């Protein structure tokens, strides 16, 4: 078929537009809804590894809360051995040893996503209290040895940080300042992953972009820090095609 000049123009415009769009995402988005869960209990959709995580009532809506008001470093969650087995099967021992040795930061793991390597992870959060921290993070790239990455916001610091936790030590990978994040207000946090490329969004604006040495692959969840008391809601996972 012979292309007319008009058809060529349309085709060129379409290609140009495609280059500007993010990688195509699958239609199937997994959303976590806490409406049928029991207030005061751990969520059925997550396995709490470090710290205290439970379903709470916030107005007419149920949310997942991390409660660090009585935080003690080294506080792995109740039933951690069984949870480690549920996450990693026969390889649970290494994960369990790392968690018990380095339970420095509260985190919980999504049950139904055994491996995430590309796409989007989003959540809404509200910092309720915390004198030291009000950390709200999306955890990803969790390995059987306990290493992971997290992009976290913090209403006390107004920054967005990509942290790496490796061999029991935390270090910053990318740090972005001046990201307005008021406490006691709901905010949208999103991570977009494509291979080794990580983008961090806060309230719809991209603040962070970093290329890792290796592609992302591992379990995902939520992360926090110290005495943070934070609500989470509308956790959604959209894998790339």
Listing of model-derived features with the role each one plays in the protein:
Residues 2-14:
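Bacterial N-terminal signal peptides that target proteins for export
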Residues 22-26:
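Sec/Tat signal peptide C-region and signal peptidase I cleavage site
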Residues 33, 215-241:
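Ligand-recognition surfaces built from glycine- and aromatic
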Residues 34, 121-123, 184-200:
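Short tryptophan-centered beta-strand motifs in secreted/extracellular beta-sheet-rich domains
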Residues 41-91:
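Extracellular glycan-recognition surfaces and repeat-rich motifs
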Residues 69-166:
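Secretory/extracellular carbohydrate-interaction modules
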Residues 166-188:
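Short, aromatic/His-centered strand-loop micro-motif at the edge of beta-sheets
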Residues 201-221:
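Short, solvent-exposed beta-strand-to-loop segments that form ligand-recognition rims
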